[in-house]
Structures are given as C-alpha cells and as structure tokens.
C-alpha cells in the first residue's frame, strides 16, 4: 500500500496548497507538536496556507510518545474546528496522533482508541491526511500503522489499519534540517531498524526485499552525513526512510520493535534510541534463522569482501556494521534506567506486542527477558 500521491525533494511543501485546492478542502486541522511550532517549523507550512488564504486550526496537544488522552482531546478539537482534512507535521508522534484522530472521526463507533489495537476492523477511510515528516525515521507518512501509549497500564499498543494511510506524503528534506543531532541519529536508526527487520521478517518477499535492501544502502551511506547536517545526508535520509516504510508497512517488523515499544512505554525511552539499542542484540538472536540475508545486509552497509566470508563471518559483519553506525552517531548501547525487577513485565509486554509474531525466530518470554538483560 502507498499514498495516492507523494512529493519528494527540496521545496516539496509548496505542493500542499495545490493539493488542498485540487481536493476542494475547506479547512485544515494542523497536527504538530509544541516544539515544532515554537521553532518555526510548523510555520513553514502554515505560512503557505496564510499566503493563499486557506483556513486552518492548529492542534498541538501531542507528546513524544502520544497518549490516549492526546487522541481523545484531538478528536474533540477536530469536531469543534469544522475542519475537513488533516495536515500532520512532525515525526511519528504527530503522524500517529493524526491517524488515530482521523480514523475515529470517520469511524465513531471506535471512540476508544484502545479498541483499534491490532488489525483494526474499521469500515471507512480515515479523514484525508496530508503528511509532512520533519524527521527521517518513522516513515509514518507511508505506513498503515500507528502506536499509542496507554499511560495507566504502562504499555504501547500498535494499531494496523489500511484505512489510515495518508492520501498525500510531502517529503521535503528542508523540513528536516532543523533536527538536532541526537534526534537525527535516533530517528535514522529507527529507519535502519525498519529496513533490517522488514527484510528479515517472516512475511518478507522479493518485492519488499528490494525496497529494504535499497533503504539499508541509502541509510548506511547517509546517516552520518545527516547527523552532521549535510545537504546530501539530509536528502539521502529523507528518501531512505521513505523507501523503508514502503517495504515494512506491507510485511511487518519484529521483536526489536516489540521491545522498543515496551521500553518507550515504561521508561519513556525515545523510540529510535530504543530501536538502536535493541537492533544488534536482536540480530544476533535471529541470525540462525535468516539464511544468507545477513550477507546482503553487510554488503548494503558497505562491508567489503562479504563474498569471501563464511556464514559466521558475514553474520558477524552485519551486526558489527550496525553497532558501528549506532556508535558513530552517538547512541548508547546500554540503558541505565533498566532494572532487574522490571524484566518480567518488560518481557511479557514485548511478547504480547503486535510486532512480535513477524520475527523470523520465535521468542519466548524467557528469551525476551535475556535479550532485555543485555542492555544492563
């Protein structure tokens, strides 16, 4: 599944007003987080709307890990606004909140977002969304997934719904240039995790393999430059993360994401950081169920001489390349907040996560406990 239309490259946001007019939209519900508004990123889009006299209302009650209340408040605000479409500006938090709001508005029988967990049984398409990513990582602009945090129960839940695909994606690297180094690094590693998990998931097949390998190659070449805020790095990451999204949205992910969701819910660990920590650990665990795929991962990441390596060597080379990239962009390999007494809850939550069944190697609660322990 893909967007009806997508625009890529510097200046792509100029197309937003053209699309709004072409669809005869009357008023935009602009979802964006407070920091993007504060630092003028959201204003790059609303300024275009102002120039053309297009009506909009801004909703900014969005946390980094969006909550049930963020969605509930957003639904009420949308109803009061008189808007007929959504412009989602931001990273995964803004995108996921927008998808949940749009789905509930179109399918009011699912007023409680928790009822949408798993493969959602909605019948109507989401309110039209124009998605404008400001991070290069989540690829939420081209996926059918969204993740919401249940603060009370200390868990994240994944909703999968073909009806929530944004109709238009506007991937403009200039909207990502203000990302600080840490956020660039973590969202970039999230994108790499999407590509590698999508490539190795049980549902992977030839067409998605093509997307994922190309994404691994582009991300591996671009992330260090993006962290240094080079034009080439930003452009590469904008494209690479989108291609990864084209792949994994159709085949799912694995336990690196299941475990990252749990760490985010319990410790509020940034999602990309949690993915970066878990990815090499999970790759080691999965290695014996991946055939020759790690050879291709290593090759895509620029490792030389992979054709001369035996299976153990190229599998190690792939994991080492991931660890080196994560280290180079400044992401820690250990989680100081992790406590031994939390391990049972963490493992049970990860085991129940919607991403877990796609992992190439089945993982028991005991297996997940030991994998979490490697972060200590």
Roles of regions detected by a PLM:
Residues 1-85, 335:
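ATP/NTP phosphate-donor binding region
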Residues 13-16, 38-41, 68-71, 94-98, ...:
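Short glycine/serine/threonine-rich phosphate/pyrophosphate-binding segments
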Residues 69-174:
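Glycine/threonine-rich beta-strand-loop-alpha-helix active-site module
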Residues 137, 242-275, 353-358:
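Glycine-rich phosphate/pyrophosphate-binding beta-alpha loops
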Residues 145-251, 366:
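Carboxylate- and glycine-rich phosphate/diphosphate-binding segment that chelates Mg2+/Mn2+
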Residues 262-301, 376:
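Catalytic phosphate/nucleotide-handling subdomain of diverse soluble enzymes
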Residues 294, 298, 304-376:
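C-terminal charged capping/lid subdomain of soluble metabolic enzymes
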